[in-house]
Amino acid sequence: MAAQVTEKLQDLHLNGQNGDAKANSTAVGQTEAGEAEDDSDDEKEDGNAAPEAGAGGAAKKKKRKSKKKKKGGAKVQSSPPRVPVSNLFPNNQYPEGEIVEYKNENSYRTTNEEKRYLDRMNNDFLQEYRQAAEVHRQVRQYAQRTIKPGQTLTEIAEGIEDAVRALTGHQGLEEGDNLKGGMGFPCGLSINHCAAHYTPNAGNKMVLQQGDVMKVDFGAHINGRIVDSAFTMTFDPVYDPLLEAVKDATNTGIREAGIDVRMSDIGAAIQEAMESYEVELNGTMYPVKCIRNLNGHNIDQHIIHGGKSVPIVKGSDQTKMEEGETFAIETFGSTGKGYVREDMETSHYALIPDAPSVPLRLSSAKNLLNVINKNFGTLPFCRRYLDRLGQEKYLLGLNNLVSSGIVQDYPPLCDVKGSYTAQFEHTILLRPTVKEVISRGDDY
């Protein structure tokens, strides 16, 4: 989920996730096949021994015959995804992300005994992140296979969100359930010049078109450990250079990120990578520009936008990344001006952490605040989520919470009309010994 640079806000590896599942399935199949071969071999050996042994051989044959094990089929994900990942990993040991060793002056961390000890102490914390990451991988890979032009954005968004809730095992319909697991924030489906924070509200009839460039940005969480990852879908290869530029820029940011690294250095590296690309559209060459007022960000428990920003252009921010922090490294490229403004109807909202206590005169605002606190806490939500909980005629109260400084609204962020924007994003953990790209998968 994008972090925007505004004065208002300033004030306030695995390629093995599916690979592991496939490997496990393959291993089960191979084991069962091996058992069948062993049984067959035993029977052949017994048959050869029978003429020599007679009745005694029959007894020996019975003794030598191996006992067949019960063959339990490997658990696999359904289509659409509905099997909780906890059922696929019953020992609660989830695949780790891509492991990247620290470089330069931080290379000692990989072998330092004290750092290794600290890393082992964080196992529960890591398993929650890895479980959420596995949910994200399985859901997004299904989405990539099935999303097609002609679908409504509502159908796409709800399909992704329903899958995340099913795989985390938290439907979010009971008070407090969504705080335990489920959607980390609403599924963003931002089209073409719209770069971020667009999800359909009730009644939206927008349909995905063949020539669209759609950013798919959603989060999954377990116990508030939010995995924030995004990708861009197109159905025309003419946009491939744009996607390649943004993917390269994001991977550059991931490579440069690390403990004690300055934000300005990361931004400079990202910009250099991104702006080395250009894309030809309708016979005109367009340089790919970084969207300079969109950033990556750190992630705190139950809070998608922490207090630090990761720029995607060169700047003077001397803030450093620190050990134990979690960051969403996301980059946005555009064929337009490389600058976004708020536009279109707002759908995303979030309770402001440590918001001041303000007397509310509207009873609808008071009631809605109670619903938000009990169901979302500081996790972002959208209007469809309130509809899903059975809330009605809440818009006046919601706007009152926004104007009172209790809830933050996140309007869609758009470049100039006619331009195209793309996004790729991963969540990384700055562990004491290594950097873990927790959301990495076979797809990106």
UniProtKB/Swiss-Prot annotation:
Regions annotated as coiled coil? none
Pfam families from the xrefs?
A: Peptidase_M24
| Domain of life of the source | Eukaryota
* Cofactor notes: Binds 2 divalent metal cations per subunit. Has a high-affinity and a low affinity metal-binding site. The true nature of the physiological cofactor is under debate. The enzyme is active with cobalt, zinc, manganese or divalent iron ions. Most likely, methionine aminopeptidases function as mononuclear Fe(2+)-metalloproteases under physiological conditions, and the catalytically relevant metal-binding site has been assigned to the histidine-containing high-affinity site.
Record EC number: 3.4.11.18
Task: Tell me which residues bind a divalent metal cation 2.
Answer: D228, H297, E330, E425
Cell location:
Cytoplasm
UniProt cross-references to CDD domains, sorted A to Z = MetAP2
What are the Acidic residues biased-composition ranges? 34-45
Composition-biased stretches (Polar residues): 15-29
MF (Gene Ontology): initiator methionyl aminopeptidase activity; metal ion binding; metalloaminopeptidase activity
* Residue span of region Disordered: 1-92
Q: Which UniProt keywords apply?
A: Aminopeptidase, Cytoplasm, Hydrolase, Metal-binding, Protease
Enzyme superclass (EC):
hydrolase
Q: Which Gene3D superfamilies match?
A: Creatinase/methionine aminopeptidase superfamily, Winged helix-like DNA-binding domain superfamily/Winged helix DNA-binding domain
Task: Summarize where a divalent metal cation 1 binds, as residue positions.
Answer: D217, D228, E425
User: Per its Swiss-Prot or TrEMBL entry, what cofactor is needed?
Assistant: Co(2+); Zn(2+); Mn(2+); Fe(2+)
A GO CC annotation recorded here is:
cytoplasm
Which reaction is the catalytic activity of this chain? Release of N-terminal amino acids, preferentially methionine, from peptides and arylamides
Where substrate is bound, by residue?
Answer: H197, H305
Specify whether Transcription regulation is a keyword of the entry.
no
Q: What does this protein do?
A: Cotranslationally removes the N-terminal methionine from nascent proteins. The N-terminal methionine is often cleaved when the second residue in the primary sequence is small and uncharged (Met-Ala-, Cys, Gly, Pro, Ser, Thr, or Val).
The record's listing under HAMAP family reads: MetAP_2_euk (MF_03175)
- Similarity-based family: Belongs to the peptidase M24A family. Methionine aminopeptidase eukaryotic type 2 subfamily.
Which protein, by its recorded name, is this?
Answer: Methionine aminopeptidase 2-1
